[in-house]
Amino acid sequence: VFQSSGDTEVLGSMLQRWPVEEVLAELRGMFAFVWHDAETREVIAARDHFGIKPLYYSCRPDGTLILSSEIRVIRFLLDKEAKVNRRALAQFFRWGSVQAPDTILEGVHCLPPGHLLRWKEGRLEIKRWFTPKWPAQNEWISSPQDQLAAVRQGITGSVQAHLVSDVPVGV
């Protein structure tokens, strides 16, 4: 029996019972989370399918891992050690953005969308957990009316799913 109506409690319960890959396969929507498994002494972090929620990390030379949903927190913790990533700066000036895993700070990375981070005893492993499944050409919808209906159904379903909240939502 859950003590709250929040999704965080449900996620924690799932992560206690099942491997993280199975939990991720069940999640829908936007999320970024960090989980510490006290039994295995492993830190697990994951980011949603399309990277809507950010997750930054820095693995220090001494093996310490810093994680945050805001880069400024990591910048603060690194203090004087934080330096500008010149390659990312050039990327920003050229394209107007910096692509994950790069960030504007050297040694600070953004976990890419649909990726999973595992950290144990100073060892960092990052792997992709989500790959979009594109329909085969023989599964394409050819009729404009059917295409319109499929798009309408997809958008309506997505909006309805995102209107579910712990607090009142207004449109």
Regions found by a protein language model. Give the residues of each.
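Cysteine-centered catalytic environments shared across enzyme families
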Residues: V1-V171
